[in-house]
Amino acid sequence: MQRLAKLISNAGICSRRDAEKLILDGQVKVNGIIVTSPATNVDTDNQVEVSGSLITSSQKSRLWIYYKPVGLITTHKDPLSRKTVFEQLTGLPRVISIGRLDLNSEGLLLLTNNGDLARQFELPSSKLKRVYHVRAYGNPDPLLKSNYKNLEIDGIFYNPQSIKLLRKNSTNSWLEVILFEGKNREIRRIFEHFGLKVNKLIRTEYGDFKLDNLKPNEYREVTKKLYKC
């Protein structure tokens, strides 16, 4: 027996939180009957439908590294009808993302068909390193010389692990930022706080996984032995 929301998440339909919302909205049936409690327990032999589609509770956990291009949002449905990551993917089963990259950011995005695996990666206790290469307009010295750790901006505390200069020319600088727990628009807000305008932001690493030679909108599957689930 397992919770209905967990089963839906593990099937790669959506995150557990979104699964709970689908259940509360009456979009889920168990053995043909609408169920509205996310805490409902189900057996593996129960028939579960989400928005009219039958799902299976048992499947092999899989993980992919995807190069998310600029201009796509990391969601399955967007109320503003913007293009999403999942609309662009071909040749993959139903997957969910591990974390997000915003509309104007690009680079490494992990995808999985297992909600529990996604949750394991996203937990702060996992302490997985995220590496970003950032191109910014302006003088980076005030940022680099500051005590940027435990920085408070508009009541929110940010704590990047490190920020270092990679290269610099007369107008732009490339910097490497390492985070262990990323907050919404954290890098952009830190840079803006020091008068820097971010004009390119690429995530190059997440935990043990690297973008390597992937190009925008390309993906590759990760060998199972390289991760635990």
Swiss-Prot record:
GO terms for biological process: enzyme-directed rRNA pseudouridine synthesis. Keywords: Isomerase, RNA-binding. Gene3D superfamilies: Alpha-L RNA-binding motif (3.30.70.1560), Pseudouridine synthase I, catalytic domain, N-terminal subdomain (3.30.70.580), RNA-binding S4 domain (3.10.290.10). Residues 2-69 form the S4 RNA-binding domain. The active site is at residue 102. Its EC number is 5.4.99.-. SUPFAM superfamilies: Alpha-L RNA-binding motif, Pseudouridine synthase. InterPro entries: PsdUridine_s_RsuA/RluB/E/F_cat (IPR042092), PsdUridine_synth_cat_dom_sf (IPR020103), PsdUridine_synth_RsuA/RluA (IPR006145), PsdUridine_synth_RsuA/RluB/E/F (IPR000748), PsdUridine_synth_RsuA/RluB_CS (IPR018496), RsuA_PseudoU_synthase (IPR050343), S4_RNA-bd (IPR002942), S4_RNA-bd_sf (IPR036986). It comes from the Bacteria. It catalyses: a uridine in RNA = a pseudouridine in RNA. The keyword Isomerase applies. GO terms for molecular function: RNA binding; rRNA pseudouridine synthase activity. CDD domains: S4. NCBIfam families: pseudouridine synthase. Belongs to the pseudouridine synthase RsuA family. This is Uncharacterized RNA pseudouridine synthase RBE_0321.
